[in-house]
Design a protein with these regions (language model features):
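Positively charged, small/polar-rich N-terminal and surface patches that mediate targeting and assembly
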Residues: 1-117
């Protein structure tokens, strides 16, 4: 991707305690994106929020389990994002946890490549 290129940003809103095959759901999504050749993905940790259950989740020192909102953000060319959504639709429909998925258009302003290890 080059500066000025049009792209799409996919956001998946989930909870930090959501699991898939006994592993954190956010990890599953990140590895799915990587396996499918997506340019990049990041997990953003919220400090407070609520979803369809209307239960407010926040980070409190005295709680044993930290249940906070997470956003998995994935950015790539439109066709790659569309394919990622289509090929993982069944997975997202089957996770059995509250979540919302959004997609919007974005423009690449800068894309600095890191060195592969």
């Amino acid at each position: 991707m080059k500066p000025g290129d049009k792209a799409k940003r996919l956001r998946i809103y989930i909870s930090s305690t959501d699991k898939s095959d006994h592993k954190p759901l956010y990890e599953k999504v990140i590895y799915l994106a990587r396996e499918q050749g997506i340019a990049g993905a990041t997990v953003l940790k919220g400090i407070m929020g609520y979803g369809s259950s209307s239960e407010v989740y926040t980070n409190k020192l005295w709680e044993i389990t930290e249940k906070v909102p997470l956003v998995v953000e994935i950015i790539d060319e439109a066709d790659k994002i569309d394919l990622f959504i289509k090929s993982n639709k069944t997975f997202f429909e089957s996770i059995g946890k509250g979540h919302i998925i959004t997609v919007d258009d974005t423009t690449i302003i800068m894309h600095g490549r890191g060195k592969k290890k």
